[in-house]
Structures are given as structure tokens and as C-alpha cells.
Amino acid sequence: LIYTTEITYRRDKEHLLLSLSEMQSQNSHNFGFHYDPYNFDSNPEKSFFIQALQSLNINPDDVEDIYFTGGVTDPRKTDFFVEYKGEDGDWHRYSPDFLVRRKDGRCCIIEVKSEFNRNHPLDGQNGLKAMAVRGWEKLNPDLLQYEMIFTSTDSVAINQLSKINDFLREGLNHDG
């Protein structure tokens, strides 16, 4: 299946767009950009992607690709989402921010959030969305890892990518 969509954004969010042409010189292995431009929700998401792309291009051998999955959430245009039961008792869809897939089939799902949301009952580290993805992780521990990155600034610190970089080099790590 091939889905097509038009990317729309508010004018005050234009700084959160990132195009393939902007990253071409830093992306010699052509990772990411399964649609163009990417329309990030926040500066930390954009910061994470740029840094992850740089890491992927340094160590590309085991990497299939990185996908920004948080920008297209319409179920008619994407088939990657996690269902979770909300506090209202109804089922809802959650589209995590990123998916990194290795050539051996192992995947790491990444969510980037503001530190403010760490304890949020829906979006937090132990929130309903995270628990739903961790349920997937438990079903497929040999193939799936889930990481949440919380930041109190407009960027993701380099050390916050350490678990993702370990995943790229060595595979899965379920230490927390």
C-alpha cells in the first residue's frame, strides 16, 4: 500500500519543518524522509531527529531506516499506531514519534516529551500510552524496544541518545 497526504502546518510552526534538501549534506545514506518535509510538533523532536540522523550516518551498517511516525496520525494514511484504553474507557490511537528499524528486524520506538509531562497520566513515563507500547515490547522482547526521552529544554542532550546509539550498535537493551 502507498499512502499519500498533504502536509499542512500553522505558520507559527514553520520553524519545526525539516526537509530532505536541508539535511542532504549530513545524510549520505539517505535515511528518513519517507515524506517531505517532516512536520515536527516540537523543537526537541526536531533536535532528536537531526542528532539521530547523524548517528545513523556514522554507523549505517545495521540500520534499515528511521521513520518519523508522529507527524501523520490519520489512520487512513498510516498503519503504524498503538491502541490504548483511555480513562474514559474508550479505545484511542497513539502514534509514537519515531521508529528505528535495524536490518535484522529489531525495532526501537522512541517518544520525545517535555520533562513537564514525565508524570502525566496519559503521556508520561508510566502513562496509558507508554503502558500500551510496553505491552507490545513484552510480547516481542527479542524484536522491540521502547524508549522515552524527556527534556526540559528545546533540544535533546547528546547523552539522552545513548540508549538509541546502543540499540544501533548492539541491538536490544531492556534495562530500563
Located regions from the model:
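Electrostatic, structured charged patches in enzyme active sites and in nucleic-acid/phosphate-binding
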Residues: 1-176
